[in-house]
Amino acid sequence: MAVIKMTDLDLKGKRVLLREDLNVPLKEGRITSDKRIRAALPSIRMAMEAGGRVLIVSHLGRPVEGEFDEAFSLAPVAAHLSRELGRDVRLVKDYIDGVDVAEGDCVLCENVRFLKGEKKNTEELGRRLAALCDIFVMDAFGAAHRAQASTHAVARFAPVACAGPLLAAELDALERALDAPKHPLVGIIGGSKVSTKLTLLDNLSHRVDRLIVGGGIANNFIKAAGYEVGKSLYEPELVEEAARLMAAARAAGGEIPVPLDVVVGPELADGAPATVRKVSEVGPDEMILDIGPATAALYREILLAAGTIVWNGPVGAFEWEQFGAGTRALCEAVADSPAFSIAGGGDTVAAVEKYGVASRVGYISTGGGAFLEFLEGKELPAVAILQERAAQS
């Protein structure tokens, strides 16, 4: 994608407004996962080492816009950044009229959602944020699907607008996987409902060579193939849609394989018994909660032969140990495959980490909604404006 990259610019002495995604989960004021902070650290360090006067901007949670709320303050993030960077990272509450930052240093601006106009992407707030900097760096892939003042309007009015290292890496990985993939291209889409991923399934069914479906989504395809699903979660009104997607994949020279066997239980609960059944033998009082070993072996074969793998969503209820074997097998197959693989989405990342294969997946996306929207073929507003600015330069 044609965007200006931060790494191509001279930052020395420049005011750099660095938009990161530091929207970390908090419990009683304590950070429960610093994954997003760790992902942003290399970009922050790089901007400081290049001599930039760095103002870091992020949102946190969903406060009432325009009102300060201690519960959504970035104070815990500032403390965490201070520890990680080995220097005091000031949290600046009132920054909209300008902040003095020394060359090679950084400050953290308070939650951008405390500013009126952020969510509405107002021109006024965009111009005021742009006035804070010489260079605007969009590095928050996790917020790239949102047209908001700190992700979009500011990029319209900043003297220079570019992609940070994290955003650039995300775009490069997604381009490699979808725009210029090595074939066979295999998609893995899991999740509970077809309705939430219909656009995604539709887009991928025309592009991939094989589309593996899992979780509750797979039940619609099992039903469309003429099998019973018992008490399993599925959407009766979308069975025809599943049949259409299977036909569309075949027409495009691809395939959406239906599981050969499944793991069933009477309910989704701790201690619920797990039984392997052929897909044709699911009982009326049983729920499909994972793929079976024969299906896992089939999917492994497909994944080991792949050139590129795009993965969003687990294939079973892996939070329960007895229904996690399929997702574990899938994780190991992706890790063992010589293909370039990209995985994204909260549940997928949790599975990859749980089964210890994170270091063997080609790229793990930091974006949930943005990753999904890119896979759906939608334009990401924060990326589109960077492309526009690059074309004008």
Curated annotation (Swiss-Prot):
What the entry lists under Gene3D superfamilies is as follows: Phosphoglycerate kinase, N-terminal domain
Similarity comment: family membership: Belongs to the phosphoglycerate kinase family.
- What's the domain of life for this entry? Bacteria
Residues annotated for substrate binding in this entry: D21, L22, N23, R36, H59, L60, G61, R62, R113, R146
What's the short name of a Pfam family annotated to this entry?
PGK
| Database matches in PANTHER family | PHOSPHOGLYCERATE KINASE, PHOSPHOGLYCERATE KINASE 1, CHLOROPLASTIC-RELATED
* Signal peptide positions on this chain: none
Q: Name one GO cellular component term.
A: cytosol
State how it assembles.
Monomer.
What species does this protein belong to?
Nitratidesulfovibrio vulgaris (strain DP4) (Desulfovibrio vulgaris)
Query: Pathway, according to UniProt?
Result: Carbohydrate degradation; glycolysis; pyruvate from D-glyceraldehyde 3-phosphate: step 2/5
Listed name of the protein? Phosphoglycerate kinase
Q: Which GO terms describe its biological process?
A: gluconeogenesis; glycolytic process
| Listed GO MF terms | ADP binding; ATP binding; phosphoglycerate kinase activity
SUPFAM superfamilies under this entry?
Answer: Phosphoglycerate kinase
Where is the protein situated, by its record's location annotation?
Cytoplasm
Main location group: cytoplasm
At which positions is ATP bound? K197, E319, G345, G346, D347, T348
Q: Which UniProt keywords apply?
A: ATP-binding, Cytoplasm, Glycolysis, Kinase, Nucleotide-binding, Transferase
Reactions performed catalytically: (2R)-3-phosphoglycerate + ATP = (2R)-3-phospho-glyceroyl phosphate + ADP
Q: What is its EC number?
A: 2.7.2.3
